[in-house]
């Protein structure tokens, strides 16, 4: 696993904390952007609620639960910046689960772009080039582990 510099860790920790305790509204900004960039992802959420339009989906409790889960994973990564490898098994498993529900690894990159978009909206002037790079580096580590799990699950299915 790649390592982050101490400066990058500091930028990530301080900016994440500055978003406040309730991360869900920031997650909603992130997913609104994701669906703008890749509307087909809406179809992967097979909840009872009608997820026909972006607005229907974004306001459904099940969907907000998923947003909460995503923010908790990011929160776990931010809390483990010194030892991200301890999340490896969890992230492998998460990648496997997403392979099973039909998410492509290319979409993980679009999630990354949406995460940066959310940070830009939420941090305003605080969104600087080094901060952007720090988050991108962390997200790349998380997604690399998820993608390894995704690939393992894919292999399994074709055995
Ligand atoms: C490409 C965009 C994504 C789509 C379309 C997607 C879709 C889904 C779906 C359909 C489920 C199963 C239903 C549910 O639990 O709500 C799920 C579960 C989950 N997702 Fe995602 N997801 C995406 C990205 C992510 C990302 C980036 C993370 C975290 C970094 C994440 C974290 C989770 C977690 C923690 C679960 C619960 C897994 C479990 O049941 O153990 N998802 N996702």
Swiss-Prot record:
It is an enzyme of class 1 (oxidoreductase). It is found in: Cytoplasm, Cytosol; Mitochondrion matrix. Monomeric globin with a bis-histidyl six-coordinate heme-iron atom through which it can bind dioxygen, carbon monoxide and nitric oxide. Could help transport oxygen and increase its availability to the metabolically active neuronal tissues, though its low quantity in tissues as well as its high affinity for dioxygen, which may limit its oxygen-releasing ability, argue against it. The ferrous/deoxygenated form exhibits a nitrite reductase activity and it could produce nitric oxide which in turn inhibits cellular respiration in response to hypoxia. It comes from Oncorhynchus mykiss. Its EC number is 1.7.-.-. The gene is ngb1. InterPro entries: Globin, Globin-like_OT, Globin-like_sf, Globin/Proto. It catalyses: Fe(III)-heme b-[protein] + nitric oxide + H2O = Fe(II)-heme b-[protein] + nitrite + 2 H(+). It comes from the Eukaryota. Residues 3-151 form the Globin domain. This is Neuroglobin-1. Monomer. Homodimers and homotetramers. Mainly monomeric but also detected as part of homodimers and homotetramers. Belongs to the globin family.
């Amino acid at each position: 696993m790649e390592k982050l510099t101490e400066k990058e860790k500091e930028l990530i920790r301080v900016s994440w904390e500055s978003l406040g305790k309730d991360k869900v509204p920031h997650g909603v900004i992130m997913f609104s952007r994701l669906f703008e960039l890749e509307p087909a992802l809406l179809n992967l959420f097979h909840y009872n609620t009608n997820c026909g339009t972006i607005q229907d989906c974004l306001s459904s409790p099940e969907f907000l639960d998923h947003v909460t889960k995503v923010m908790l994973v990011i929160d776990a990564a931010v809390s483990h910046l010194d030892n991200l490898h301890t999340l490896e098994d969890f992230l492998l498993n998460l990648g496997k689960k997403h392979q099973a529900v039909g998410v492509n690894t290319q979409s993980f990159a679009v999630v990354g772009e949406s995460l940066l978009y959310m940070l830009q909206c939420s941090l305003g002037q605080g969104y600087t080039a080094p901060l952007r790079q720090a988050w991108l580096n962390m997200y790349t580590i998380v997604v690399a582990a998820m993608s390894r799990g995704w690939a393992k699950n894919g292999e399994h299915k074709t055995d």
